[in-house]
């Protein structure tokens, strides 16, 4: 079969066009650092990369949640330790008031000191996180959970004991909040321990009331304090366990990120030296093709005589 100059020219032009497309593809790979830049480059790898991107996005969100939750736990832990410490100081004040023959003035001093400590405990119960949300209000994070009514001398809990959960891993959630108010309540979240301490402190301040009149109340409050302190201690232990869990999850997410990065490299990564070599080979082939095309276009019938 005779191949005409026109056919040969068309073949050469198609070959150069293909080389140009291939060169552009190689250049795009070199620029992006990726072998797969669009679905047509490798449909199977493209689908795997989409799934990988979803995995990376999930891991990033998990890591963000872990950091935020760990910060919240740290603030909660500090508040619990402060509350526990002040509660134990109140216990010491009551023990001192109960075990000695104190004057009305001395008892009043104990009462005022206890009131100051109660103010500090109320502040701990109304702790906010860095986002401005109340940590110990259950799901009512925008409402100050603890209020005190001076007229009735009663502490009231305005939050709830519902849990807030954070997703920190694939199918893994951890409770964000601590039901701290229950540690100072005889039942539910009535804050009875705080209320009874407040009423006792006010009696101690009132010089018209003899210490013997509230001696039994001191004993009752001491027993309640021991129960409350024990509950807070349990909550601190629970927070410590949660922090350890978060640390483990954080390390796990770091490992998954490394695995994802290696998978992405295997699926879409390039060998720069190999791509450069292919581009040079493509360039030389195209240059030779141009030269041949130029010579073919100059041929005439006289070249065949």
Regions found by a protein language model. Give the residues of each.
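Amphipathic alpha-helical polymerization modules
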Residues: 1-141, 202-305
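Cysteine-poor, low-complexity segments in flexible/peripheral regions
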Residues: 140-210
């Amino acid at each position: 079969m005779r191949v005409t100059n026109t056919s040969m020219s068309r073949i050469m032009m198609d070959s150069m066009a293909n080389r140009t497309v291939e060169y552009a593809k190689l250049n795009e790979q070199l620029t992006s650092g990726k072998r797969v830049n669009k679905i047509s480059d490798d449909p199977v790898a493209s689908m795997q990369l989409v799934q990988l991107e979803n995995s990376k996005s999930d891991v990033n969100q998990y890591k963000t949640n872990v950091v935020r939750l760990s910060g919240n736990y740290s603030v909660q832990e500090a508040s619990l330790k402060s509350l526990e410490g002040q509660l134990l100081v109140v216990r010491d004040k009551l023990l001192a008031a109960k075990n000695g023959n104190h004057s009305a003035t001395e008892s009043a001093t104990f009462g005022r000191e206890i009131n100051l400590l109660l103010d500090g405990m109320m502040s701990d119960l109304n702790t906010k996180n860095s986002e401005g949300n109340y940590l110990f209000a259950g799901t009512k994070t925008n409402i100050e959970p603890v209020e005190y009514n001076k007229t009735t001398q009663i502490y009231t809990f305005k939050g709830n004991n519902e849990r807030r959960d954070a997703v920190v891993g694939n199918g893994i959630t951890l409770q964000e909040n601590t039901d701290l108010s229950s540690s100072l309540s005889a039942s539910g979240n009535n804050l009875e321990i705080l209320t009874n301490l407040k009423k006792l402190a006010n009696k101690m301040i009132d010089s018209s009331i003899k210490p013997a009149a509230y001696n039994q109340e001191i004993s009752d409050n001491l027993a309640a304090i021991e129960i409350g302190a024990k509950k807070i201690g349990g909550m601190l232990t629970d927070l410590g366990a949660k922090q350890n869990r978060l640390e483990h999850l954080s390390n796990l997410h770091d490992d998954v990120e490394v695995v994802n990065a290696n998978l992405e490299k295997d699926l879409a990564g390039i060998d720069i030296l190999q791509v450069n070599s292919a581009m040079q080979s493509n360039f030389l082939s195209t240059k030779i093709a141009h030269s041949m095309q130029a010579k073919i276009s100059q041929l005439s019938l006289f070249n065949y005589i």
